[in-house]
Every structure is written in structure tokens, then in C-alpha cells.
Amino acid sequence: MKTIYLIGFIGVGIRNKQYQSEPGLIKVGHVGINFENDNRILGFHPTPEAINAIGGAREAMNWLRNRKDGNRLDGALQDDTAIFERAYELSLRGARCTVWQQAIEFDSDTFERIREQAYNWYEEQKLFPYAFPLSIEDIEWDNCATFPRRLGLTLPEASGQLQRYIPHLQAHGQAWKPKGAEE
């Protein structure tokens, strides 16, 4: 058996003045996937090009927060290892962003198929519609928490709401530490 990890944290908050200089994903929270024996954590979120096209990070956040209109941006899998490492560092300093992981085991063939698909999409920067959780049923979207379903992973919680999702990682997993972090 081989293991795929769902890794995630609840953000420090978009209005918390102490963290205003932090990247947006630290503020809102994030979920990524990691494959056994791989150092990278892949996360799904808007591409830099999509963010720049709408006028920058603040404008992108405002656009996505308008959920009633079904606003979406182009998103892709990206190497977000540094984001999870930063959340871990902040949690050690008292920020409410403990990083959690849940291990999911697969037979070798299924693991390799999922891993190959994820890395193909990552390398080609395949675009998918990214949105904050929408209740509009006829609009296709994913966010970081729901994207793993595209790879055939069963989600611990399907709403895409990190306030609901992360407690499932916590209940069925363990706290995450970067490779090389002190025990």
C-alpha cells in the first residue's frame, strides 16, 4: 500500500491586522495533497495570471467573495509547500493555523495513476474553474478542499468550507510537520 496525504489548515483571518503581510492562502486557509516519498505539497488555487488579470490579490479576493453571482477564476495545481511550512511556523508562534494531515492508503497501481494525473496537470498547468464554495448547482467549480475529488479521492467533507473540512482532518489524522522539523 502507498499513501496520499490530504494536508490543510484554517487560515488566520483576512481582517487580522497582525497577519496582513502574509499571503492570501495563509489568511483564508488551504488544503493540498502530498504523495508518499515526495517533498512537494500540491494545492489548487487561482493562477498568478488570473489574479493579475483581475487587478491583484485584493481584487481577486473581493471577486471570489461575491458568491451569489458564481464568480470564478482560472485555477491550477501549484507547488504550495512553502505555504504549509509558513502556516506551521506561524502555528508555533501561537497563530490559530495548526496544519493537519490525513493519510489515505491506495494499492500501488491506483496510487501511481492518481500521482501521474496530478503531476501531469501540475506540469501542464491545466486550468479548472476555482471558486469559493458556491451553492449554485449548475456552475462547475472547485476550491483547494474539493479539488482532490477530480483525482478520484474521497473527500473527508464535501462542502469546500474549511471550517467544516479541517476538523475532519484533525479527527481522522494528525498534526503535520515539515520534513526535518524537530520532533
What is the meaning of each model-derived region?
Residues 1-139, 173-183:
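Non-catalytic ligand/cofactor/substrate-binding and regulatory segments of enzyme domains
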